[in-house]
């Protein structure tokens, strides 16, 4: 059945989990015209979630589906234009749903931050999804919408100004307040590191800057592109003089998503596009020391985890980390915030900065970004790109999602610096 004639515009799968509940709240508050259903393993838990969502959601149908029973996923996907999924770790639970959406031509969006899940989705399902017309959109939360859309904003502005193509482009996390990590995030990191520590080929792939570009020979040779660089701020932009930056833990994932966006769009950002991510560590007397220390710790933890995580007793890991389904309190979510700034220099020497900021914590923001992605896919279909297959937020939804994000409380914009 054509997606436009299906029973639901959006099915939210995983609605009873921590991120799923937050996403359901955003969808209920959106007051959109979308036909929405909630899905998960337990009808009783789904009813309990729906009861807390307010009057707009009380008529939303409930669907029982389980990743361990692929036929239920395919039946669910066949009823929807769009499936949003918060069920992770995606490395463990995600591929059956990707397969179901690829087979049924259903658009899909997730919150993954797991490189090998992304690579496996591309290798196994990109061609079929492209053939059936499905958009399988990876990383529609804090990983990696801010990274991906900041570069897309810059690309769009540079095209408007006719100032060439993007060259050196650097994201800096300028401010960030996050006081708790969810059990789901820990489980995802653990699963990702378990995969690479058990599989030498997976380890090789995640250390390649172009992990998510399957035609590796088509990528330009731009020399080393370290995942966790440290810089004087002035090396990135004069506006950052006096600041120091260091390794950003999510850079290894986000940078690959951004590079895939460039490749999917026929390298429209530029063939000399070099991209990195760091976090600001301030401009105090201790900032240079903090830059070196943080970068060493982040690079060491990720590198050692990717190689040796399988040697840690799983029971010990589970005992000392947050439980699945847990996350920061409502009060903590409200106190959080973040601001990303992305600086670029073009082939003509013009300089720009893009901003992406949200005045809530990363988890509440993630839910809002996923909900906005779902509404964009369901309601703004005439503004989506023509691309199909396993895609990225910018390549699939760039302009349409940028237009919708301010209504979710996101502050975005570009500034020409010189």
Swiss-Prot record:
Species assigned in the record: Mycobacterium leprae (strain TN)
rRNA-binding as UniProt keyword: no
One Pfam entry name: Sacchrp_dh_NADP
Family affiliation: Belongs to the saccharopine dehydrogenase family. Enoyl reductase subfamily.
Enzyme superclass (EC): oxidoreductase
The protein's name in its UniProt record: Trans-acting enoyl reductase
Record key words, sorted: Lipid biosynthesis, Lipid metabolism, Oxidoreductase
GO biological process, one term: glycolipid biosynthetic process
Enzyme Commission number(s): 1.3.1.-
InterPro entries assigned: NAD(P)-bd_dom_sf, Saccharopine_DH-like_oxidrdct, Sacchrp_dh_NADP-bd
GO CC, any one term: plasma membrane
GO molecular function, one term: oxidoreductase activity
Recorded superkingdom: Bacteria
């Amino acid at each position: 059945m054509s997606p436009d004639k299906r029973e639901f515009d959006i099915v939210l799968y995983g609605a009873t989990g921590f991120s799923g509940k937050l996403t359901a709240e955003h969808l209920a508050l959106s007051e959109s015209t979308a036909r929405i259903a909630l899905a998960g393993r337990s009808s009783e838990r789904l009813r309990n979630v729906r009861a807390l969502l307010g009057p707009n959601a009380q008529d939303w149908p409930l669907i029982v589906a389980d990743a361990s029973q692929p036929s239920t996923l395919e039946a669910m996907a066949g009823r929807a234009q769009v499936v949003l999924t918060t069920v992770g770790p995606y490395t463990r639970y995600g591929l059956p749903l990707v397969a179901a959406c690829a087979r049924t031509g259903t658009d899909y969006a997730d919150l993954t931050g797991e490189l090998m899940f992304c690579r496996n989705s591309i290798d196994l399902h990109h061609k079929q999804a492209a053939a059936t017309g499905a958009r399988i959109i990876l990383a529609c939360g804090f990983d990696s919408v801010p990274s991906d859309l900041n570069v897309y904003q810059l690309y769009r502005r540079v095209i408007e100004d006719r100032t060439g193509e993007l060259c050196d482009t650097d994201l800096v996390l300028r401010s960030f307040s996050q006081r708790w990590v969810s059990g789901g995030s820990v489980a995802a990191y653990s699963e990702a590191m378990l995969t690479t520590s058990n599989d030498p080929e997976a380890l090789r792939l995640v250390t390649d800057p172009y992990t998510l570009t399957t035609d590796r020979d088509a990528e330009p040779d731009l020399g080393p592109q370290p995942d966790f660089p440290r810089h004087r701020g002035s090396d990135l932009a004069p506006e950052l003089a006096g600041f120091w930056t260091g390794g950003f833990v999510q850079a290894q994932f986000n940078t690959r998503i951004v590079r895939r966006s460039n490749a999917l769009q026929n390298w429209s950002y530029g063939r000399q596009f070099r991209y990195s991510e760091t976090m600001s560590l301030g401009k105090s007397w201790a900032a240079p020391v903090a830059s070196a220390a943080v970068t060493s710790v982040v690079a060491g933890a990720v590198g050692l985890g990717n190689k040796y995580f399988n040697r840690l007793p799983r029971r010990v890991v589970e005992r000392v980390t947050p439980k699945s389904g847990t996350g920061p309190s409502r009060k903590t979510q409200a106190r959080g915030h973040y601001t990303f700034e992305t600086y670029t220099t073009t082939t003509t020497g013009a300089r720009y900065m893009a901003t992406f900021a949200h005045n809530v914590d990363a988890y509440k923001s993630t839910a809002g970004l996923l909900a906005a992605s779902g509404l964009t896919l369901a309601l703004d279909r005439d503004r989506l790109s023509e691309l199909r297959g396993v895609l990225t937020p910018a390549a699939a939804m760039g302009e349409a999602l940028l237009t919708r994000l301010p209504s979710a409380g996101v502050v975005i914009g570009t500034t020409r610096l010189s």
